[in-house]
């Protein structure tokens, strides 16, 4: 059978006829390919089969069976962040993706509670006093009178002072119409914010008080806007805090600011004078007054 086929299985020696027949067959098939492949191996300097084996073994060694570490889910990562980290992450996220700013603001409430604003503003004011350069100045009460602080002190606290003033204006603008329709809420925050503004330290150089004076001008304009809105709201007239009460509060703020709130004070005085003819006598309590008559007089 082997003679009819023309070759022998394996590498056993064969007859001359079979050998010549096998050689003639290999000339047109495998041997030419093998010789070319051998030439390529000689040019590369080695067998590619042996070069690939270490790589295959290395890949198998890197495969590790068992539990592997993984990052926290988003909800857990947020739980582990403190307030400062969360704020910085949100701000950085909005900077990288400005298109989400409108969505983020749409999810915010239209206004916050009075305590939230006051807590934030008090913290900003405390930062101003905490960064005064001398301990005797840090222990000084805001209402203490005396000569103003020097230029060096202003440089040290300027950034904290501006942060407080900007925060104060931002909080007030969010708490006035049309953002908030409750005039009493706006007036209460104005009362507290104006009191905190008066507690800022005074500087001996007039130019160093520029930012504080500009903020007083803005606060005065906000007072005037809220007073106009309140005098058109009947709920303001029927509230426990009367016009006379707010007039006294605004007079105290105007005295502390050295007349910087004279414009809203005059506006409220004018409105109060228009109510004098319908004010109840001294023996009659305010609860016995008729709100309808008072409202008709305003209209």
Swiss-Prot record:
The keyword Disulfide bond does not apply. Involved in ubiquitin-mediated protein degradation. Regulatory factor in the ubiquitin/proteasome pathway that controls the turnover of proteasome substrates. Targets proteasomes to the nucleus and facilitates the degradation of nuclear proteins. One of its GO terms (molecular function) is proteasome binding. Signal peptide: none annotated. Binds the proteasome. Keywords: Cytoplasm, Nucleus, Protein transport, Transport. Belongs to the cut8/STS1 family. It comes from the Eukaryota. The lineage of its organism: Eukaryota, Fungi, Dikarya, Ascomycota, Saccharomycotina. One of its GO terms (biological process) is nuclear protein quality control by the ubiquitin-proteasome system. It is found in: Cytoplasm; Nucleus. Transmembrane segments: none annotated. The gene is STS1. This is Tethering factor for nuclear proteasome STS1. Its main location: cytoplasm. The keyword Cytoplasm applies. GO terms for cellular component: cytoplasm; nuclear membrane.
């Amino acid at each position: 059978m082997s003679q009819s086929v023309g070759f022998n299985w394996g590498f056993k020696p064969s007859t001359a006829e079979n050998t010549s027949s096998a050689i003639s067959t290999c000339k047109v098939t495998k041997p030419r390919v093998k010789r070319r492949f051998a030439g390529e191996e000689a040019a590369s300097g080695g067998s590619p089969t042996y070069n690939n084996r270490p790589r295959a073994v290395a890949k198998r060694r890197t495969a590790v069976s068992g539990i592997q570490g993984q990052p926290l889910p988003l909800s857990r990562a947020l739980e582990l962040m403190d307030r400062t980290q969360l704020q910085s992450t949100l701000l950085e996220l909005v900077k990288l993706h400005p298109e989400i700013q409108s969505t983020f603001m749409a999810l915010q409430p239209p206004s916050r509670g009075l305590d939230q604003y006051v807590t934030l503003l008090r913290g900003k004011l405390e930062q101003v006093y905490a960064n005064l350069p001398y301990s005797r100045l840090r222990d000084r009460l805001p209402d203490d009178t005396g000569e103003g602080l020097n230029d060096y002190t202003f440089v040290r606290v300027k950034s904290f002072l501006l942060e407080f003033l900007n925060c104060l204006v931002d909080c007030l603008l969010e708490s006035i119409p049309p953002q908030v329709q409750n005039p009493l809420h706006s007036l209460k925050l104005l009362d507290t914010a104006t009191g905190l503004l008066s507690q800022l330290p005074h500087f001996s150089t007039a130019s160093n008080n520029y930012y504080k004076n500009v903020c007083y001008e803005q606060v005065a304009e906000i007072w005037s806007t809220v007073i106009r809105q309140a005098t058109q709201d009947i709920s303001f007239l029927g509230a426990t805090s009367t016009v006379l009460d707010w007039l006294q509060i605004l007079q105290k703020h105007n005295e502390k600011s050295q007349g910087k709130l004279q414009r809203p004070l005059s506006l409220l005085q004018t409105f109060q004078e228009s109510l004098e003819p319908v004010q109840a006598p001294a023996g009659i309590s305010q609860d016995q007054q008729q709100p309808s008559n008072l409202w008709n007089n305003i209209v």
